[in-house]
């Protein structure tokens, strides 16, 4: 029996804002969508792999999610670190950086 990754989920307060963020920051686009009366699921993808970022939008939710003290993150690879870093710095979304390790973290509109 083998397992493969399929997606990771982030709950969002403003679906359009989050979709815009992920497209501008990383080039992720909507692959598919599921809508119900109470919530919407949008699956974003990079166009190159099968892995998806699922955005869950609960229609009635107004208060921000408590993300706690967990250090979870979505790790991405780029073939041009310097250009990616410059773009994200210009967007003002870098929230942590470790130059020695060659990594930085960005924060999305919901604090992920």
Regions found by a protein language model. Give the residues of each.
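Core segments of cupin and vicinal oxygen chelate
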Residues: 2, 9-52, 105
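A short, acidic/glycine-rich surface segment
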Residues: 39-41, 60-65
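Short, charged/polar surface micro-motifs in flexible loops or helix N-caps
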Residues: 47-51, 60-62, 80-82
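Eukaryotic phosphotyrosine signaling hubs
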Residues: 5-7, 69-73
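Exposed loop/turn and edge beta-strand positions of beta-sandwich/beta-sheet ligand-binding modules
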Residues: 38, 70, 100
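Vicinal oxygen chelate
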Residues: 1-3, 7, 31-33, 43, ...
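Helix N-cap motif at beta-to-alpha junctions
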Residues: 14-15, 78-82
